């Protein structure tokens, strides 16, 4: 039930939903309420200008990332596993390749980079939607084959497919690590910088004494030009991700997950 409510809420808090709703509402209002129609369109226009503003979006992203844009990994330490939060791609079973989510794909590649550098021994991917289809048929073999083709052997990978949210990422990961006899203090959590605070606090609350390493880190632009303020529809869509994270933090604090 918690998962279903979260999915519905994502739609309700989306700036895209607000703008579209304000545009279409006037068509269902009485023609005599022209002032209300105009008001809806004006508000929709103002919201579009605000949420299509890239500098504002980047500033908000930086505030959400905060101190978690850095890493708490210890110099010279080799970790038993990197725990990567899923949702970064979808698996095309017919073509055997991945379609990446632009904001999340860095999680996987940073974990692979850490492994190639010898900083981690294994990679645990939790809540990996790229390895399962809607009808429940697993594409895990295709995913492992793909990773093998890019140089990551299957012996390195641990794939957990059941987690649907950050809380389940934590509890399911702990169960797997405990079964393998891996101390969670020897693991590092890898996810997006804006998602790291909620993830890290949730994992710690679930009993995982992990360090963290953020991907997709934020860096403030050194200078701004007039063109930086041009409206961008992509920015409106990306606010969805930021609102989801902000709302998620509030909910996790309320229910005691974080």
Spans of features found by a protein language model:
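Membrane-embedded alpha-helical segments of integral membrane proteins
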Residues: 1-29
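Hydrophobic alpha-helical segments of integral membrane proteins
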Residues: 1-9, 56, 60-64, 239, ...
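Membrane-water interface of alpha-helical transmembrane segments
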Residues: 7-10, 31-41
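Hydrophobic alpha-helical membrane-embedded or membrane-associated segments
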Residues: 11-18, 45-49, 148
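Structural signal for the C-terminal ends of transmembrane alpha-helices
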Residues: 25-34, 52
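Hydrophobic membrane-insertion alpha-helices, especially the h-region
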Residues: 39-53
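A structural signal for short, hydrophobic/glycine-enriched beta-strand patches
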Residues: 50-232
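Extracytoplasmic/luminal low-complexity segments enriched in Pro/Gly and acidic/polar residues
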Residues: 218-227, 235-258
């Amino acid at each position: 039930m918690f998962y279903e409510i979260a999915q519905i809420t994502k739609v309700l808090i989306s700036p895209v939903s607000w703008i579209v709703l304000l545009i279409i509402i006037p068509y269902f209002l009485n023609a005599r309420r022209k002032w209300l129609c105009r008001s809806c369109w004006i508000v929709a226009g103002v919201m579009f200008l605000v949420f299509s503003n890239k500098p504002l979006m980047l500033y908000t992203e930086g505030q959400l990332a905060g101190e978690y844009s850095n890493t708490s990994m210890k110099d010279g330490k080799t970790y038993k596993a990197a725990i990567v939060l899923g949702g970064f791609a979808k698996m095309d079973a017919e073509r055997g390749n991945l379609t990446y989510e632009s904001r999340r794909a860095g999680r996987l590649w940073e974990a692979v980079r850490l492994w190639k550098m010898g900083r981690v021994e294994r990679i645990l991917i939790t809540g990996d939607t790229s390895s399962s289809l809607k009808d429940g048929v697993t594409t895990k073999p295709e995913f492992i084959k793909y990773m093998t083709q890019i140089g990551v052997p299957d012996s390195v990978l641990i794939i957990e497919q059941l987690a649907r949210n950050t809380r389940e990422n934590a509890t399911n990961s702990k169960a797997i690590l405990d079964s393998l006899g891996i101390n969670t203090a020897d693991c590092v959590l890898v996810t997006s910088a804006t998602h790291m605070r909620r993830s890290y606090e949730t994992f710690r609350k679930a009993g995982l004494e992990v360090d963290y390493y953020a991907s997709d880190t934020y860096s403030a632009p050194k200078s701004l030009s007039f063109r930086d303020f041009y409206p961008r529809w992509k920015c409106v869509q990306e606010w969805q991700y930021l609102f989801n994270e902000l709302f998620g933090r509030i909910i996790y604090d309320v229910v005691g997950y974080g």
